[in-house]
Swiss-Prot record:
Keywords: Lipid biosynthesis, Lipid metabolism, Magnesium, Manganese, Membrane, Metal-binding, Phospholipid biosynthesis, Phospholipid metabolism, Transferase, Transmembrane, Transmembrane helix
Protein name from the UniProt record: Choline/ethanolaminephosphotransferase 2
Organism: Arabidopsis thaliana
Annotated Pfam families: CDP-OH_P_transf
GO terms (BP aspect): phosphatidylethanolamine biosynthetic process
């Protein structure tokens, strides 16, 4: 069974991307650089290839983090931090110029939008792993993934209802990534231990502040992001969706229902970690973030496809396919509570199965949708020339 019906094909042919970026950093600093940088690519270079190259930078960064900090709680060599920063900067640059290349070559398409944002969704997990090694976050790495994934999903959800992707004056793809790669470069100078020690020791000027002075520096960053970035962003997303739904006499309950799969996914993984006898997130942070990141990529991709195909607003039931593995994982972890701490199946293999399941789900979705869109529009994914009629 395909993902796109006859109505979806007709909507794809009419779709036009709409996006607004209010960032001053992008407007006055990065955009002029990107406008020059895109010219290094030949006109035969397909935009999706540039997107894929940018994605590979993040994949390389995540692999470096795994090699030199398997549990994300030990300091890697300082050159690794510099590599993380450089690779993230290159990812941001390639992610910004793929759309410019599409306009240069007159090859813009709904597939490009889906491919771009789909890679960005997976990139949340990959960059979280890289940052986890830089800041020695350990099990907190999962929470850093949450605070990157939730605003991303909120922006995608808002885009689905408003038909315009609006980036505020301070936003994640611009200022957020810039802060992160500057953090990587900074860590290459001071060392990863700077993030793992108490706030008062890392910044002696504020050692007099009660409670905070004993908190780990990386957790200060985590809580600051939650209160000053994630919560305000979600409030704006929800407000904008409410305005659109109210103006169309729609149901806000149906709109909020689209958030159910992500909330359930995060809650399910946290409950699994709580029940597990081996402390999943601490011992296997890469696998937990990778498996959950792939499930998240499927959720984002499915919502973007619903937007491109002008599907009715509301929960897409097949989004819940990303949750199918969790009942088995939870049941297996629960058997350990009933069997003296020994689960029915070793938790490592259950976690590995989770990653294989979500990878298979995402791969099937991605390959199927790419095939259906290229067939419907008569285009190629990695070639600029159109298919012969």
């Amino acid at each position: 069974m395909g993902y796109i019906g006859a109505h979806g094909v007709a909507a794809l042919k009419k779709h036009k991307y709409s996006g607004v970026d209010h960032s001053y950093l992008a407007k006055y600093v990065l955009q002029p650089f990107w406008n020059r940088f895109v010219k290094i690519f030949p006109l035969w270079m397909p935009p999706n290839m540039i997107t894929l190259m940018g994605f590979m930078f993040l994949l390389t960064s995540a692999l470096l983090g795994y090699i030199y900090s398997p549990k994300l709680d030990s300091p890697p060599p300082r050159w690794v931090h510099f590599a993380h920063g450089l690779l993230l900067f290159l990812y941001q640059t390639f992610d910004a110029v793929d759309g410019k290349q599409a306009r240069r070559t007159n090859s813009s398409s709904p597939l490009g939008e889906l491919f771009d944002h789909g890679c960005d969704a997976l990139g949340c997990a990959l960059e979280t792993m890289a940052y986890g090694s830089t800041a020695m976050c350990g099990r907190d790495t999962f929470w850093f993934w949450v605070i990157s994934a939730v605003p991303f999903f909120g922006a995608t959800w808002e885009h689905y209802f408003t038909n315009t992707l609006t980036l505020p004056v301070v936003n994640g793809p611009t200022e957020g990534l810039a802060l992160i790669y500057c953090g990587h470069f900074f860590t290459a100078i001071v060392g990863a231990e700077w993030w793992a020690q108490p706030f008062g020791k890392s910044i002696p000027l504020f050692s007099w502040v009660p409670f905070l002075n004993e908190m780990q520096m990386s957790r200060i960053i985590l809580f600051s992001m939650i209160f000053f970035a994630v919560i305000p962003t979600l409030a704006i997303n929800t407000s904008n969706v409410y305005k659109v739904v109210h103006s169309r006499n729609g149901s806000m309950l149906l709109a909020l229902a689209m958030l159910y799969p992500l909330v359930t996914l995060i809650a399910g993984v946290l409950i699994w970690d709580y029940l597990s006898p081996i402390d999943l997130i601490r011992n296997y942070p890469h696998l937990v973030v990778l498996g959950t990141g792939l499930a998240f990529g499927f959720l984002v991709g499915r919502m973007i496809l619903a937007h491109l195909c002008d599907e009715p607003k509301g929960l897409k039931t097949n989004m819940c396919m990303s949750l199918l593995y969790l009942p088995f994982a939870l049941a297996n972890a629960l058997t350990a509570r009933l069997n003296d701490g020994v689960p029915l199946v070793d938790e490592f293999w259950v976690l590995l199965g989770y990653c294989i399941f979500t990878l298979s789900l995402y791969a099937h979705f991605a390959t199927s949708v790419i095939h259906e869109i290229t067939t419907a529009l008569g285009i190629y994914c990695f070639r600029i020339t159109r298919k012969e009629a």
